[in-house]
């Protein structure tokens, strides 16, 4: 067949085994095996390129076949399979190249458009900053002396900070961590525990909570089911805090929040549907703890967290929602990034993008990381490489644009609504107090100290030594779980193929803990089996140790053993985000050989204690190991360098830099907390009518409050207003109203009249009606059925109602009155897709509704304002241009219902409008942060603040007014607006009304990046369904059932 000659030639070589290659030309592997075999050569080349274990199995079966004809047929079939695999890989490479080209063009276009708004005052100073890159990056001085540290401590002692860290997956506990037990319980677990412990010991920090998942499964230790665990401080920071100053709730704690299946330990890829449940549980803990701390250290004022720090994508997603719900700053550490993993998997060519998404939930993970970038004040990375080669893959971060925006902010110049998180490199810390490197080696006895004159060898030493026939040889140590990305098999190949290295050294592989290979995960067992086969293949018995078990307390002793033998630590991972084990090894006096991809580059730059290698080149790995093992002078120099510079990676150093970054970031907290009802304590209690009359005078005229454009229209008629500045007046007037409203805000004081609180605070149950669609299409009939289902409890007032919708308040008012409803039928109105919040007045003498004057300050974080609006208008015009010059405007601004925090647009043809993910991507590339929602059967689009939504509005009601989320029952249709998924999950009850949706609503979700099952678990006991027809009795029945769950 044409184009297949290369397959035929290989096939002929395999079937007709000829003389071997010259020794000088053949690889060391082939020379050691003896006679050259094209069969083996061909298969090895394919395995090297594709890592396809199935091909190797096919080859083994073909070799075992006795019949020549059958053998040849199998070999031929194998070659055709390889050819197909090669074609698939080529196709994936072409698709990847096209994707990269498209992204590069999008990025360049986004930069141009973002710069266009800022071009009129772009200065040479900004250009200099862009050119010099990091030269302007302020660098905090490192603490290199005890005096400097003591000075810093004295400055911090008066502070009493509350910090929240989040790390969801894996098994987390303070002592005897089971690192390596599975792929989720690795370096991140150790890092977050030690970070929490270190921060809890810092002056100025009162309490640190590390939030994680509570696991009450019989498959794991009981300790993971304990709600709270205090982290005992280490005596390693040198701080002399007086114990008398420590309060009742001070210190560092692991707090385990129950969410997801109560009796199962599940992998991180399966946690995504349960994130909303965690957020609600965490929100409850933080609010309650903030109140407790307020009583202890805040003079009765709530002490909110100074920051919420999410670790990895799942915790980042959670931290973003918590940050929005509480209005406090968020920090992010990615640890391992989804886009980078996707790139690596696509390069391997073994899986399609759909397969990758199904296996790793990669698109859900990437969107969580993008949202985390939207919400984060600071992104903490371990290395510059993580910023330059990994974070730059994301729509929400552009290093070039970030430098421009930072320069403008320093000069006090407008950024036109654009925001970019600050990337900060803070290497992880380590405890060094208990590390005492041995001075002796295995060739001579170590000098006995006075403190330990006859100290016995640790048991783990004997466990390792039993593998070796010559245990005194230098030990090459690798400590990593059996994961393909850790590249352990290449290390074993390098060791096995290099005879001089085998003669000089032993190899120790600490690959986590295991009982039986069959009990391991398929991936881990596959790696371990490959290692065992390679040991057998190269006959490495007596030269390689691979113990089955070790404790976390044994790890320092393993490092000491390797250093005692004058060995080398190696990390051959394809990519290492940081490389904490490299720092641990250096602290124990071990030189290193490490991958040149990732964090080890920065570690080597600081410590200068080893060599970097290409992890794909096994020859270079073998050469580097041999060089360090054979050259004792080089070994000694690397050891001394590592020990001399290791203090730069201490936990006090890390924590000081960490806290300094938080202090320099923009601080925010709930609006009512800062104002805290000034002056109320010195005033006489107001009567209900007086308290509401002040608010009425300012805002209870609905036509003025919600539709200030009428005022502008009047001014235009009088010739006093131009079109150019009308929008600016609207925004400033709206802000002025809300500032005035703050003077008449609801009081938090319990001794005030009950009428100052929204009515829903008195309810035993709250029905939230969030059914989407067209209000003229019978949706109000459903509202009546829900009212009827509440029955006498509605009349008695034990059940309250909240209407949650994409419509504006004037539209809702018109619809309600036209359908015979009263505005007092609902206690609250969540309008404009969650960007507006109103309450029913409790005094019949007053007007109907009251705006929550604190809500806008709660959701305005990173709101682009007029700069965002202008960009959206340009985007709308570009949609029309793409459809032809004669085409009518596809999408137009709806000024009638737009507000200061919701830009509304009319869509005339939804088939010509791209999905929401494309618009959000375009805005992110231009550093504009927003939440885009297609609503009202696709006829409207609302653009609101990035952390605002209808589900977040419910969390606000809990934080602001103490309304328990578990008391809420949210009613939704079978489908809804594009924010529909956020309403389903959480601790509240959800009732899905089957049949309440239409084709238009379903089409809004047709272009999702991931299925609904990656967002919410419809099997949750908090979710129930009512069959098509939705009778009042059925609704009442399902609510009763859910309440008992």
Swiss-Prot record:
Residues 93-141, 222-243, 662-692 are annotated as: Disordered. GO terms for biological process: sucrose biosynthetic process. Activity is regulated by phosphorylation and moderated by concentration of metabolites and light. Pathway: Glycan biosynthesis; sucrose biosynthesis; sucrose from D-fructose 6-phosphate and UDP-alpha-D-glucose: step 1/2. Keywords: Glycosyltransferase, Transferase. It holds the Pfam family Glycos_transf_1. Belongs to the glycosyltransferase 1 family. This is Probable sucrose-phosphate synthase. It comes from Beta vulgaris (Sugar beet).
């Amino acid at each position: 067949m044409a184009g297949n000659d290369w397959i035929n030639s290989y096939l002929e070589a395999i079937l007709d085994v000829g003389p071997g290659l010259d020794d000088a030309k053949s690889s060391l592997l082939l020379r050691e095996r003896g006679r050259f075999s094209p069969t083996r050569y061909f298969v090895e080349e394919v395995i090297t390129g594709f890592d396809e274990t199935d091909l190797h199995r096919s080859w083994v079966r073909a070799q075992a076949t006795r019949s020549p004809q059958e053998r040849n047929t199998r070999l031929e079939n194998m070659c055709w399979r390889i050819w197909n695999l090669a074609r698939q890989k080529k196709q994936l490479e072409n698709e990847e190249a096209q994707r990269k080209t498209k992204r590069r063009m999008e990025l360049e276009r986004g930069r141009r458009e973002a710069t266009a708004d800022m071009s009129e005052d772009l200065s040479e100073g900004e250009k200099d900053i862009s050119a010099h890159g990091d030269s302007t990056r302020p660098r905090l001085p490192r603490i290199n002396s005890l005096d400097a540290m003591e000075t810093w401590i004295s400055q911090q002692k008066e502070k009493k900070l509350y910090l929240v860290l989040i790390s969801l997956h894996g098994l987390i506990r303070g002592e005897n961590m089971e690192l390596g037990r599975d792929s989720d319980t690795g370096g991140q677990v150790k890092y977050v525990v030690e970070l929490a412990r270190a921060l809890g010991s810092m002056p100025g920090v009162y309490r640190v909570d590390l939030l994680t998942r509570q696991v009450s499964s019989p498959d794991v230790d009981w300790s993971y089911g304990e709600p709270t665990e205090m982290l005992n401080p280490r005596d390693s920071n040198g701080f002399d805090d007086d114990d008398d100053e420590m309060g009742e709730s001070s210190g560092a704690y692991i707090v385990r929040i129950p969410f997801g299946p109560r009796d199962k330990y599940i992998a991180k890829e399966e946690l995504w549907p349960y994130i909303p449940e965690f957020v609600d549980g965490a929100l409850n803990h933080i609010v309650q703890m903030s109140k407790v701390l307020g009583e202890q250290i805040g003079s009765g004022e709530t002490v909110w967290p100074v920051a919420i720090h999410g670790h990895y994508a799942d915790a980042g997603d959670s931290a973003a929602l918590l940050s929005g719900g509480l209005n406090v700053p968020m920090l992010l550490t990615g640890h391992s990034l989804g886009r980078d993993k996707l790139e690596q998997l696509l390069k391997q060519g073994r899986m399609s993008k759909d397969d990758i998404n199904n296996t790793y939930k990669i698109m859900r993970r990437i969107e969580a990381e993008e949202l985390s970038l939207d919400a984060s004040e600071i992104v903490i990375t371990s290395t510059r490489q993580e910023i330059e080669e990994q974070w730059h893959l994301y729509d929400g971060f552009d290093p070039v644009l970030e430098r421009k925006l930072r320069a403008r902010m320093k000069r006090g110049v407008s950024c036109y609504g654009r925001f970019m998180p600050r990337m900060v490199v803070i290497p992880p810390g380590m405890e060094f107090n208990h590390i005492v490197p041995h001075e002796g080696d295995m060739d001579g006895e170590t000098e006995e100290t006075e403190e330990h004159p006859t100290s016995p060898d640790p048991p783990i030493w004997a466990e390792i030594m039993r593998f070796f026939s010559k245990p005194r040889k230098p030990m090459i140590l690798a400590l990593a779980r059996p994961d393909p990305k850790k590249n352990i098999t290449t290390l074993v190949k390098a060791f096995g193929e290099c005879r001089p290295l085998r003669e000089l050294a032993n190899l120790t592989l600490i690959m986590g803990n295991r009982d039986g290979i069959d009990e391991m995960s398929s991936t881990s067992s596959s790696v371990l089996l490959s290692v065992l086969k390679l040991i057998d293949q190269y006959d490495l018995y007596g030269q390689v140790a691979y113990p089955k078990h070790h404790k976390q307390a044994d790890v320092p002793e393993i490092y000491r053993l390797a250093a005692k033998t004058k060995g080398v630590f190696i990390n051959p991972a394809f990519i290492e985000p940081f490389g904490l084990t490299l720092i641990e090894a250096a602290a124990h006096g071990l030189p290193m050989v490490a991958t040149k991809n990732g964090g080890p580059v920065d570690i080597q730059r600081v410590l200068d204690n080893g060599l970097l290698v290409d992890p794909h080149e096994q020859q270079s790995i073998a050469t580097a190991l041999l060089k360090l093992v054979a050259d004792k002078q080089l070994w000694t120099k690397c050891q001394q360098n590592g020990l001399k510079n290791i203090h730069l990676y201490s936990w006090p150093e890390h924590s000081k830099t960490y806290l300094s970054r938080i202090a320099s970031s923009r601080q925010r907290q709930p609006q009512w907390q800062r104002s805290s009802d000034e002056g109320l304590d010195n005033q006489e209690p107001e009567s209900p009518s007086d308290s509401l009359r002040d608010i009425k005078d300012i805002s209870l005229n609905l036509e003025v409050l919600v539709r200030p454009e009428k005022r502008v229209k009047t001014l235009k008629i009088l010739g006093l207003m131009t079109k150019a500045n009308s929008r600016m007046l609207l925004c400033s007037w709206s802000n002025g109203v809300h500032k005035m409203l703050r003077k008449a805000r609801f009081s938090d004081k319990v001794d005030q009249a009950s009428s100052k609180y929204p009515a829903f605070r008195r309810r035993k149950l709250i029905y939230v009606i969030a059914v989407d669609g067209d209000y003229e299409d019978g949706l109000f009939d459903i509202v009546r059925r829900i009212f009827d289902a509440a029955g006498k409890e509605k009349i008695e007032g034990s059940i309250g109602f909240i209407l949650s919708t994409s419509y504006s308040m004037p539209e809702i008012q018109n619809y309600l009155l036209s359908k015979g409803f009263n505005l007092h039928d609902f206690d609250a109105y969540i309008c404009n897709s969650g960007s507006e919040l109103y309450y029913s007045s409790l005094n019949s003498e007053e007007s109907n509704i009251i705006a929550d004057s604190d809500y806008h300050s709660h959701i305005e974080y990173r709101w682009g304002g007029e700069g965002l609006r202008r960009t959206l208008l340009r985007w709308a015009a570009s949609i029309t241009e793409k459809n032809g010059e004669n085409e009518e405007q596809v999408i137009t601004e709806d000024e009638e219902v737009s507000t200061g925090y919701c830009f509304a647009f009319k869509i005339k043809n939804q088939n010509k409008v791209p999905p929401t993910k494309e618009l959000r991507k375009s805005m992110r590339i231009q550093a504009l942060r927003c939440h885009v929602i297609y609503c009202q059967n696709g006829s409207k689009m609302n653009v609101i603040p990035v952390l605002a939504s209808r589900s977040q509005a419910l969390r606000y009601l809990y934080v602001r007014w103490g309304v328990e989320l578990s008391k809420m029952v949210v009613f939704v249709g079978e489908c809804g607006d594009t924010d529909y998924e956020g309403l389903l999950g959480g601790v509240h009850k959800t009732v899905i009304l089957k049949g309440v949706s239409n084709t238009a609503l379903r089409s809004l979700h047709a272009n999702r990046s991931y299925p609904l099952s990656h967002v919410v678990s419809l099997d949750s006991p908090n979710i129930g369904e009512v069959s098509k027809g939705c009778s009042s009795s059925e609704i009442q029945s399902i609510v009763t059932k859910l309440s008992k769950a």
